[in-house]
Amino acid sequence: MSHFKNYQISHDILRALEGLGYTEPTKVQQSVIPAALERKDLVVKSQTGSGKTASFGIPLCELANWDENKPQALILTPTRELAVQVKEDITNIGRFKRIKATAVFGKSSFDKQKAELKQKSHIVVGTPGRVLDHIEKGTLPLDRLSYLVIDEADEMLNMGFIEQVEAIIKHLPTERTTMLFSATLPQDIEKLSRQYMQNPEHIEVKAAGLTTRNIEHAVIQVREENKFSLLKDVLMTENPDSCIIFCRTKEHVNQLTDELDDLGYPCDKIHGGMIQEDRFDVMNEFKRGEYRYLVATDVAARGIDIENISLVINYDLPLEKESYVHRTGRTGRAGNKGKAISFVTAFEKRFLADIEEYIGFEIQKIEAPSQEEVARKKPEFLAKLNDRPESKKDKSEELNKDIMKLYFNGGKKKKIRAVDFVGTIAKIDGVSADDIGIITIMDNASYVEILNGKGPHVLKVMKNTTVKGKQLKVNKANK
């Protein structure tokens, strides 16, 4: 049996993987991790939900030099949600090595990101537009950059970001390792790899066609005006613990969410017209299981790693065949079984034919639930509707439960460095350097993570201990 211990990975990274519940590597991880550790250029064709973030995150954290303050790796993602997700994953994987990851994306304070990039940032994750902005303004130093990851490259192409990606690449050092990940490999992506990569190794992790065998696919034919009635019947008979309902437009999402809410269904929505903070809040609440139904546009179809979504409903069939793969890929993740049901009108039949040709099989046509079936399932559905959904455990919860972040009211302007905190805190009785996590030094403040449940002890001692001869105020950090 393959195990992460078989790779050239340090104890700090292995310890974090164990805390995250990673036991054996997925297929893509088995192929990518050894090659990435050898600093090979890679073109990886792999489905969503295959564990690919960890496949590049683990080697990047392993290869990063903690003592180097400037960014050593840049990860480009098509969406803000994915940038935040990848940053969190990198932070968790590199927790005990004190790897600092920074996320930069649009519709968020440029100055705040600029200030964060001035601190030690080993790995930067961002969307192409904002990354290019930082590069052109000189706020993202590139002279120590050794690794570039282009994630969800086909989605970059669909969203019109490839020119920005190329502009970014032209600013980067030519001596670097480049890894490109994509669910599909259109011609333009192949061209990008030929132009900017050095003899890349091609890795393809085959599933049963373009969509995993863990997903049961079905189609129900329906008139547009009968869709909502059908949705109610399907939700009642399927009675999922966790479900995403996809619509084509934000207007449709808003309308459908209001209608479900009026019926008392525990639901929320996510689409591109919402402000960033609201989108993040909605996704986090859905991850935690605070409601069962998420109504969404394609903005939620990529990059959000939520296990145990049992049902995806295409209320509106996607007009682009790639979107079908990415939407339905939200279920059947991490080895779990899932189901994808698509509502198809007469107008949408031609798009269904394109999808079936693309995924390589005919999707099973099923009848709408009968009224007898709906009546039979109704009591069970209503009983679950009145129960609060069971809160889901975030995979990083176990890893982070013994971590306390401390705030100190001094930083660069007081000539304080990360090593000063390490030297001072490691001298406390019962505390070692292994108990110190990520350290962030700002102009007038510093944040230090204390690991292994030793935060309260360190907080108490540091109230009366100087750092580099300076007595700093210390409190448990709010963020």
From Swiss-Prot:
Residues 214-374 form the Helicase C-terminal domain. It is found in: Cytoplasm. Induction: In rich medium highest expression in exponential growth, expression decreases in stationary phase (at protein level). ATP binds at residues 46-53. Keywords: ATP-binding, Cytoplasm, Helicase, Hydrolase, Nucleotide-binding, Ribosome biogenesis, RNA-binding. Disruption phenotype: No visible effect at 37 or 16 degrees Celsius; no change in ribosome profiles. A quadruple disruption of all RNA helicases (cshA, cshB, deaD, yfmL) is not lethal at 37 degrees Celsius, although both 50S and 70S ribosomes are decreased, while growth stops at 16 degrees. It is an enzyme of class 3 (hydrolase). InterPro entries: DbpA/CsdA_RNA-bd_dom (IPR005580), DEAD/DEAH_box_helicase_dom (IPR011545), DEAD_box_RNA_helicase (IPR050079), DEAD_helicase_DbpA (IPR028619), Helicase_ATP-bd (IPR014001), Helicase_C-like (IPR001650), Nucleotide-bd_a/b_plait_sf (IPR012677), P-loop_NTPase (IPR027417). Signal peptide: none annotated. It catalyses: ATP + H2O = ADP + phosphate + H(+). Residues 404-479 are annotated as: Involved in 23S rRNA binding. GO terms for molecular function: 3'-5' RNA helicase activity; ATP binding; ATP hydrolysis activity; RNA helicase activity; RNA strand annealing activity. ATPase activity is stimulated by interaction with RNA. Residues 33-203 form the Helicase ATP-binding domain. DEAD-box RNA helicase involved in the assembly of the 50S ribosomal subunit. Has an RNA-dependent ATPase activity, which is specific for 23S rRNA, and a 3' to 5' RNA helicase activity that uses the energy of ATP hydrolysis to destabilize and unwind short rRNA duplexes. May interact with RNA helicases CshA and CshB. Belongs to the DEAD box helicase family. DbpA subfamily. Contains an N-terminal domain that binds non-specifically to RNA and a C-terminal domain that binds specifically and tightly to hairpin 92 of 23S rRNA. Undergoes a conformation change in the helicase core upon binding of RNA and ATP. This is ATP-dependent RNA helicase DbpA. It comes from Bacillus subtilis (strain 168). The gene is dbpA.
